[in-house]
Amino acid sequence: EITNIIYDNFSINLPNARDWFDFSFEESGKFYPVNIKITTTRTIDNLNCKLGIYYALTGDIPSFNNGINWDQYFCNLKTNLKENSKDYYFLIINKNDVQDIFIASLKSLEKISPNGNNLPFQAKWNENRHPVQREFKEAKDFIIKCFADSLKLRADAYFYFKRYFNEYF
């Protein structure tokens, strides 16, 4: 497993079971959570990172897990949203060329796409090789706008279903 190879060669922290990152490390007192993506880099991958979003937009390590309901999640996010320098990182490994390895971070992704079936959104890593430097407000708006677009897509499916199968409501 990739995490064990990294652990054997670098000073990293392994996560607890079902944690919101694949590994983390600390440098100069700062916490860096990292999600590993093994991909062709040319296909769209789901970014199931709602706790990574919380960390990047609040600067706080979540006190809850991925099972938190959406109402509580959005309430916590809105309440604790504040300018900060924290981010959620991705270690991208090209499965077709293991020499092709790069890092990206949530706030500096160049392009993300809404996905109503698998929140919060998707990314094609080949389109995210070059980080975009953003001020906090720009990064927050970039992330939350795409998240909102994904939620709208999810809601649309509900309304279409209800239109044709209203007798089930």
Model-assigned labels for residue ranges:
Residues 1-21, 27, 32, 38-169:
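Nucleic-acid endonuclease domains
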